[in-house]
């Protein structure tokens, strides 16, 4: 027996007699069978090879409108800039091309464009590394043409997150203001090119939603948020504030947005649905538009021609106002896209609208709006790639199922279902899709018409995996009730009948792979068990020699001889959520709890194998899959709700 890396954290033991390797997760042994052809030459001391291929971020699906604002702008290059997860996206709609700024290491929360329309600032939240080291919140100033980082501000200064950022609009835009999410919501002003703080001041105990400079007077700033609006003066290195006085006007719970009109008037929109005009330089209301929206006014945008556009929350309306604050035109955003979060001026009379349901729309108040960027709204776990097309499916907590084209980057179709979804799998014909939900219900959908073909219920816990056998004759449904339900499949996936259930795991089912010849399948469970099953009898296969040399059609199980090298030292067994092997059998991609995507060579059977590592997601990466032709890999984010498409090169 030779052993490797003896230590409390993770020991790997190779037994030649048993033809197995044993690793330990949380002190629990996980024995894995070595195929006969590898056993004679296998050694734990062989160095793993880095894959010659790399991943390059190709497309980002999604937008963060749910809880961020003023984060969508059109640049002179024709690109719209916005963010999701830890990626700032520059999307050229005409060329159908994206570029990505990847300087951040956790969620981006705010974005500002410099008056030069090239320089961009983005602020991020505090994060932690895999080792538990804090990653401090900060602001990055970068060049949108070269994507190079110019300056990093505020490391060790900001607390929790940077929630607002803005450049001064006059004086060459040489100042930048930022607000953090500390208890005092500190407003700070920076000479960003020198990376030096000019001054800071406690802003408010309550949430601050906007901080901005006056367009012509660089010594004036405005902040607003929960039950306040402040007018700030910056003089001789100190900040002084005057509170906005509502006097006889209804004081709103939240002042949600602010913009400036040509004459110097300040306009605010609030949670009461009112627009207030604050006379130039003053802190008093000089005009009001009551009930401009039913529900909050979430967005304001002053247009080039001096008119004003507002966007509504509950009423989902985009309204164009004349110079006398009379309503000129209005249009409602379709309900599926959700309330308006932010509005940006496009070319001509076009507008870009970001919504709280993480969509970006393009259109005008005259013509209405159509979808430009579709996003998921809540945690995303289900991912499956089509067996013979450049398409994939995502589904999640938001009860939405999207079938995407990886080439057009748009949904081919979308449908809502009754329960939050957790898993997905295509029939080998590609004509039927299974979707597992958190309630024990699972559905079969027609992939052409997206019609419901059938609905079944197994147990009352979440269905973590739905997987058709390679020959299309069986469907295995793995549940959090520790059972795998096996169905026979007819009519190309349209008719299923329950054959039996596989009982033997003492914890919930996490992953499942079929044999290439469909004669058996293997499962992983929440307590790191690997079991093998005969679908015909639904009985466990206990003879090691029966399964040792099986060729597996896929490698999605995170525990097994071919993949155990993905586990880092000290891993606790829940750190890696998903793994996928390329169809050509050369690459393996893993998705972890630290926002990272790793690319390994396959088989990955040396302890702590070498990998290329990629950021972009900002919370746990929940799933990973290769497109049918291995040209792209796809990863899904948990809390960041994004889908990242990686080119394999």
Swiss-Prot record:
It comes from the Eukaryota. The keyword tRNA processing does not apply. It is found in: Cytoplasm, Cytoskeleton; Cytoplasm, Cytoskeleton, Spindle. Its main location: cytoplasm. SUPFAM superfamilies: Quinoprotein alcohol dehydrogenase-like. The keyword Ion transport does not apply. GO terms for cellular component: cytoplasm; microtubule; mitotic spindle. Residues 10-649 are annotated as: Tandem atypical propeller in EMLs. Keywords: Coiled coil, Cytoplasm, Cytoskeleton, Microtubule, Repeat, WD repeat. InterPro entries: Beta-prop_EML-like_2nd, Beta-prop_EML_1st, HELP, Quinoprotein_ADH-like_sf, WD40/YVTN_repeat-like_dom_sf, WD40_rpt, WD_repeat_EMAP. GO terms for biological process: negative regulation of microtubule polymerization; regulation of microtubule nucleation. WD repeats lie at residues 56-93, 97-144, 151-192, 195-234, 241-280, 285-323, 369-406, 410-447, 452-489, 495-535, 564-602, 609-648. One of its GO terms (molecular function) is tubulin binding. Interacts with GRID2 and may also interact with GRID1. Interacts with EML3. Binds unpolymerized tubulins via its WD repeat region. Tubulin binding protein that inhibits microtubule nucleation and growth, resulting in shorter microtubules. Contains a tandem atypical propeller in EMLs (TAPE) domain. The N-terminal beta-propeller is formed by canonical WD repeats; in contrast, the second beta-propeller contains one blade that is formed by discontinuous parts of the polypeptide chain. Belongs to the WD repeat EMAP family. This is Echinoderm microtubule-associated protein-like 2. It comes from Mus musculus (Mouse). The gene is Eml2.
């Amino acid at each position: 027996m030779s052993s490797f890396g003896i230590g409390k954290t993770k020991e790997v033991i190779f037994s030649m007699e048993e033809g197995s390797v044993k690793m330990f997760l949380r002190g629990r042994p996980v024995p894995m069978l070595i195929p006969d052809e590898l056993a004679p030459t296998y050694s734990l001391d062989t160095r793993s090879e880095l894959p010659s291929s790399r991943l390059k971020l190709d497309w980002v699906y999604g937008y963060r409108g749910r809880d961020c604002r003023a984060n969508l702008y059109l640049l002179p290059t024709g690109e719209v800039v916005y963010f999701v997860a830890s990626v700032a996206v520059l999307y050229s709609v005409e060329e159908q091309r994206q570029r990505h700024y990847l300087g951040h290491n956790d969620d981006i929360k705010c974005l500002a464009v410099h008056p030069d329309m090239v320089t961009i600032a983005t602020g991020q939240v505090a994060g932690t590394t895999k080792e538990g080291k804090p990653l401090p919140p900060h602001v990055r100033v970068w060049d949108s043409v070269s994507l190079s980082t110019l300056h990093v501000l505020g490391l060790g200064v900001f607390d929790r997150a940077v929630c607002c950022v803005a450049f001064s609009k006059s004086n060459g835009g040489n100042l930048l203001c930022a607000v953090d999410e500390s208890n005092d919501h500190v407003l700070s002003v920076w000479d960003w090119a020198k990376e030096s703080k000019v001054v800071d001041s406690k802003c408010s105990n309550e949430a601050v939603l906007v901080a901005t400079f006056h367009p012509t007077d660089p010594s004036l700033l405005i902040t607003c948020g929960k039950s306040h609006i402040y007018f700030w003066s910056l003089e001789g290195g100190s900040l002084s504030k005057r509170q906005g006085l509502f006097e006889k006007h209804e004081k709103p719970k939240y002042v949600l947005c602010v913009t400036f009109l040509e004459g110097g008037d300040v306009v605010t929109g609030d949670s009461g649905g009112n627009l207030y005009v604050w006379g130039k330089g003053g802190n008093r209301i000089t005009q009001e538009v009551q009930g401009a929206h039913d529900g909050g006014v979430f967005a304001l945008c002053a247009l080039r021609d001096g008119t004003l556009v507002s966007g509504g929350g509950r009423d989902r309306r985009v309204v164009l106002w004349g110079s006398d604050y009379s309503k000129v035109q209005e249009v409602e955003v379709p309900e599926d896209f959700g309330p308006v979060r932010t509005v940006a001026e496009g070319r001509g009379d076009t507008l870009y609208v970001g919504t709280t349901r993480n969509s970006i729309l393009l259109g005008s108040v005259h013509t209405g709006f159509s979808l430009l960027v579709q996003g998921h709204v809540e945690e995303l776990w289900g991912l499956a790639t089509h067996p013979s097309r450049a398409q994939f499916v995502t589904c999640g907590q938001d009860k939405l199922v999207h079938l995407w084209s990886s080439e057009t980057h748009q949904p081919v179709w979308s449908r809502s279902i009754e329960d939050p979804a957790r898993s997905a799998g295509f029939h080998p014909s590609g004509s039927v899709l299974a979707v597992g939900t958190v309630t024990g219900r699972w559905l079969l959908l027609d992939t052409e018409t997206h019609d419901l073909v059938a609905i079944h219920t197994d147990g009352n816990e979440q269905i973590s995996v739905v997987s058709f056998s390679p020959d299309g004759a069986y469907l295995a449904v793995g549940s959090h009730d520790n059972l795998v339900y096996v169905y026979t499949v007819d009519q190309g996936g349209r008719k299923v009948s329950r054959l039996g259930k596989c009982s033997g795991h003492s914890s919930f089912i996490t992953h499942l792979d079929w044999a290439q010849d469909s004669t058996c399948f293997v499962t992983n469970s929440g307590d790191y068990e690997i079991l093998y099953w005969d679908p015909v009898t639904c009985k466990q296969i206990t003879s090691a020699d029966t399964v040792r040399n099986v060729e597996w059609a896929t490698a999605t199980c995170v525990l097994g001889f071919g993949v155990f090298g993905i586990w880092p030292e000290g891993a606790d067994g829940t750190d890696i959520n998903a793994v996928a092997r390329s169809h050509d059998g050369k690459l393996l991609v893993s998705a972890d709890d630290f926002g990272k995507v790793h690319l390994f060579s396959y088989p990955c059977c040396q302890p702590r194998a070498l990998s290329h590592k990629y950021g972009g997601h900002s919370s746990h990466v929940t799933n990973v899959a290769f497109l049918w032709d291995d040209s792209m890999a796809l990863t899904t984010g948990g809390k960041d709700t994004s889908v990242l498409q990686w080119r394999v090169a």
